[in-house]
Amino acid sequence: MSLRTLHDVGELAMPEKGLLAELDSGGYHQCGDGSLPTAGDTARAIRASFLRLLLLGAPDVPRLHEKGLRLRGAWVTGILDLEECRDLHGITLADCRFDSPLILRSAGIDSLLLDGSVLPGLAAERLQAKGGVHLRAVEIDGAIDLRGALLDGDLVLDGSSVVAASRSTPPI
């Protein structure tokens, strides 16, 4: 079930409260020291469902700044599923660790920046980005699928490593 209001989220963790408080600032919200967290670092955990709600907006959520969502150093828990979501501002999740693949199939975004992050896959078939997709120094232990993606900016993979899943592994 998708969250529709902030009330649906329930009790917010400290990193979530901090991000919510800075949502309309246009600046980066930094979890901890902003470096890449270890898996299971609950002090820096932010739920993917909460991020989705912030990106899509809700009546009881502060307005997202025009620069988009800017987060550094979080452990993103759960599946951040933005499939078919349109007109999203920029998404910056730098030096973040994801425990599930990021799903952007048929999404429409301004830009995507995942620099320094670690994730188990990126499903972005038919993604439409007005700007670039920046994956500098990213570690992906799984598939990257950008088939049919339309990028008005650059695709940057400098310093990244991808360990593709075996062909017997089902797609995300």
Where are these regions (language model features)?
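N-terminal leader/targeting and pre-domain segments
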Residues: 1-172
